[in-house]
Amino acid sequence: IALVGEGRYADAIRLLRKDNPFPTTCGFICEHPCEARCRRNMVDDSINIRGLKRVAADFAGEVDPPQCAPSTGKKIAILGGGPGGLSAAYYLQLMGHQTTVYEMLPELGGMLRYGIPNYRLPKERLDDDIRAILKTGVQVKNGLKIGQDITIQELRQQYDVVLITIGASTDKKLGLENEDADGIISAVQFLRNVGKNQIIDLTGKEVAVIGGGNVSMDAVRTAKRLGAKKVSIVYRRRVADMTALPGEIEGAVAEGIELQTLKAPASIDVDENHHVKGIYVTPQMVSSIRDGRASIKPTGEEDIYIPCDVLIVAIGQNIETHHFEQAGIPVERGKIITKSTGAFENLPGVFAGGDCASGPASVCLLYTSDAAD
């Protein structure tokens, strides 16, 4: 804050990178929990810390990373080119280790690139952060999928350490009949397609999105920008119970998104061609409130029909676990299970961190320093 106040923007970026190699990205999308705890709140309002990060990034220009420590001769493979993997690669490279990032998609960034819409995070600004990370000497191998193009066993033979930071990039299912119908897509896949410029024309269509998190808000607002005639959010609890940021909810409402709250998905309606026509939802009521969050139960009323041409499911994310289980890596309830250090009991030199080990979290990068540890 003091450095920005003095106009020393490049120094501010250097300071931020000591703990977080994505200062520009955070200036756009960080959930700024630090502002909620800012002591200035005792006087009037918090300091706009996220905004100051963005000011520093906007005015600093290109700031080179610090010089790396002398080489240790150690080689580290990092599986996953998202924020966790790139953060680990950055700090490990600065320590003198040679890191190689394996990424299955064409470009680095993970959910930052393929999950967050461009209106929230311009991809050229994300590239500013990634470019600085790669300047440290991090090597990259794109288009390789673990278990298909290369195995954990092969990587263990080639590298001193293997770090798994694959994130949580697959979707959870509703568990309803006809969920495989045409016109139904997960929010993760929908946003990934948009991120890869595989644009879906939604002109004149009715779109329903199930879920109340930030991914849900990204999906509905993206659908609106793709020309949808009507976009609705279907959520089983209250607006107050949504995990999305208040600003994202307000933005969606301001753009004409309809909020269908206290409605739980019950069944999916399809036509003779097995294309989604709509969804039946069961009205809910609050049965109790604990720690500010409502528990719900059916009201006993008849199900309500919500017509839609496209149904987007945004109820959470999982990780791809099949190959890792085959490699002897413990997996439980959609997470890779590690010791507190990120290591495994019977796999020396193999570690895991980020969303795949802790469970899906916000991409405001609060966890990224853990990946380097």
Regions from the PLM with identified roles:
Residues 2-65, 142, 152-192, 362:
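Glycine/serine-rich phosphate-binding loop and adjoining beta1-alpha1 elements at the start
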Residues 3-6, 11-19, 42, 46-50, ...:
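Beta1-alpha1 glycine-rich phosphate/pyrophosphate-binding loop at the start
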Residues 21, 82-83, 107, 213-215, ...:
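Residue-level detector of alpha-helix initiation sites
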Residues 55-70, 128-148, 171-226, 331-346:
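Glycine-rich dinucleotide-binding loop and its adjacent helix/turn
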Residues 74-81, 206-210:
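Beta1/beta-strand and adjacent pyrophosphate-binding region of the FAD-binding site
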Residues 148-154, 273-301:
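Conserved beta-strand-loop-beta-strand element in the redox core of flavoprotein oxidoreductases
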Residues 182-205, 289-360:
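FAD-site-proximal beta/loop scaffold in flavoenzymes
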Residues 367-373:
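Conserved small/polar residues in nucleotide/adenosyl-binding loops
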